[in-house]
Amino acid sequence: MRKFLLTVCCLGMFGSAFGQSKLDLKSLMELNKLRNTSIPTYNARTRSLEQPKTIPTNIMAMVELKDQNNRADLEAQGIKVLRVRDNIAIALIPLADVERIANLKCVRRMQLPRRLYQKMNLVRKEVGVDKIHQGTDLPQAYTGKGVVTAVVDGGVDPNHINFFKEDGTSRFAYVGKIVENKRNNNGYQYDKYYPRTVLDTMTQANNAHALETFKTDDDESVHGTHTLGIMAGGYKGNITYGEAVGTYQAKSVTGANPFYGSATESELIASCGDLNDSYIALGIDDAIEYAKTSGPSPKPCVINLSLGSNIGVHDSTSVMNKYLSKQGKEAIICVAAGNEGEKPIALKKTFATAGETVKTFLTPTDISPVDEGGTTYYNFRNGQIAAYSKDSTVFEFYINVVDIKQDNRTILSIAVPNNLNGRDVTYASKAKYVNNSNDVNKDFAKAFEGYVSVSSAIDSETNRYYAFAEVMTGDNQTTNQDEDYKLTLEIKSKKAGQSVEVYTDDQNIYFDDNDEDGFVKGSTNGSISDMACATNIITVGSYNVRNRIASLDGSIYNFNGLSTGESFPIGEISSFSSFGTLGDGRNLPHVCAPGAAVISSVNTYAVKNKDLDYEDDQLQGKLKKGKDTYYWHQSIGTSMATPVVAGGVALWLEANPSLTVKDVLRIIQQTARKDNFVTSTGDPVQWGAGKFDAYEGLKQVLKEKQTNGINGVRTTESKDAPIITKAGDRTFNLFLASAKQLNVRVFTPSGQLVHSLSAQGNEYNLNASSWNKGVYLIQVNGNKAQRIIIY
């Protein structure tokens, strides 16, 4: 199941506090939210608004320095620097001092935390992992030995049996938990949990605890346990699971667990807790550092990020995306494309003339009521909107209140202020939503409960003009009970040929024409997560491999309830899979993998949480072992597809630890399958290179390693020497990189020719099943013969 989390940031900036700021508009609005406890914030888990209780002393921020040597300048200001990667630092900033630090000469830009959202048996067979585990036509089997596999996620249960070795000990190196803690002077709490055998050997153990005592970071989420299980879960013992016995019925059977993952013998790391980009970057850094320093030589590392946010410029230039790009040079990082592929949350327009407009309705995604104290919000609109010009040319940007019964007449227009410094304009229904009571507007209150805020600036990195809006409204149930008043977005060009890109975060808003003339729908091209637009990462979309779920209650379900019809057609692109054509010309995702539906291990503490109401109809596997019970459950999303790729890549890294992200991406694109579904369903951009093929990719890795060696050291005499590898009991793979045709001759040691053949291409599978036992010499295209032995 997909779970979409919502957020809301407060508005109403302190007008006198900001000059030309190096903080982006989202950070400015987030700063005001952190400083104000009167404005309710949205809790997506409970679908209710809550009142903040405390103001943090410090906040973790990402600071882009003008030079990597500026760390000392930052520390001279009393700032605690936690990490530096090239010229980007993760630092603790006093909340009262954010603007001053941002405007230091040594600082280029600063970004405050952005909340990110969590976005197998059939799967292993589909992508060829079963063949890899069995060593089919390979020199050996691969299971991820010697590779570090990590997730940054929430809902992690590291003591699930899926993450134990056969001897019952943990495969985890450590689990890191980072959470906001306003009572802590740092503003956060970072604890690490190690297996007790490791903890007992540590001389310094500040904030270090025994892994065996860890339960979970979040008993309302199964997400992180599920994604890690897909990537690297290794339990293969018996469990009880649902098995179909007809169209509608299932039975419970006991047998070998069919739902284990790909990198079953890899070393595990999880970073969990609160999911904002500063914490996520810190968790990634620590996983990379562990992989580099925990052994006699650096270990290859794969990191799965089934997280994202749609708000942002959708290129590689944000501080977070630049930091992620730098991290991608030291680990293979796989990022989910997003689950908004069906949502029109992007809008792109090139204006033919100056003064031309584009208008769209801001439509709520979910119309069910949301409560806070004594206030109920109906037709709840909650989210952020960002609009970007192609260059520094400004455009007019309005959030309008219109009356649909009066031919969409605008009764109130909220326009960006005539400044470029981030100072906002806010309209609110009540004083509790704002710092300045002058922002309360009776016409706005007639239509809505809540507030709208808009601002604009020039992006200091790209020199692009952009406008930003925060929206949190519910329909006034006295004067807008009939829903006659609506919110719209309007953009007006300043010159012919001007282009704009507009994105909303899809937390509770999408762009729609409302079947009204003069308004436009949004586009699904552009639904890609902003974080997935970084360079030096692998971005993953989803396709369907399972649409009927055999559950432990004896029934078979699809995603419309009991299995009575087709949903998520097998082999086709998952309709929810996000995608986008970026302004820099890139199409994302890079590739798709099975994401609907995938069965994997889930957080025991979430299943046992009575508020979540997990029953056997939602569970596909169960194991009771002593006093503990472990569970397996289906879920869908690019969150599930991404660890399929990450786990497959871990197997490649076992075969060749020297692979870079460029190598991995190239091999993914070369070996991806392009079947009829890829060419006939979904948007071509949505598919990327096609369907991820771990098996064919591994074969390519082995070929390139044998041909080119590791770090440039060749394992054969020349690039044109043939590569002969054992592919089975009496089969051999012959490969000659430069050949268009293979001419193969087989001799006895005495020089007698016993076999000869020709084959088109540079690869051939030689079947020697009928040959007598003995030693043979194989010559390919006249090269030096190589010896094989038939047993």
List each model region and its residues:
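Autoinhibitory N-terminal propeptides
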Residues: F4-L6, A17-P139, V148
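N-terminal domain-start motif of subtilase-like serine proteases
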Residues: L28-I55, D97, Q118-G168, A205-V222, ...
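C-terminal subdomain of the subtilisin-like protease fold in secreted/lumenal serine endopeptidases
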Residues: S48-Q51, Y248, S294, P300-S309, ...
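Subtilisin-like serine protease catalytic core
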Residues: T136-Y279, P298-K299, G328, G341-I345, ...
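Active-site core segment of subtilase-fold serine proteases
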Residues: V156-G229, G237-Q249, G261, K405-I509, ...
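Substrate-binding/access-modulating region of protease and related hydrolase catalytic domains
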Residues: G273-F351, P369, G374, N379-F395, ...
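C-terminal outer-membrane/trafficking sorting elements
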Residues: V713-Y791
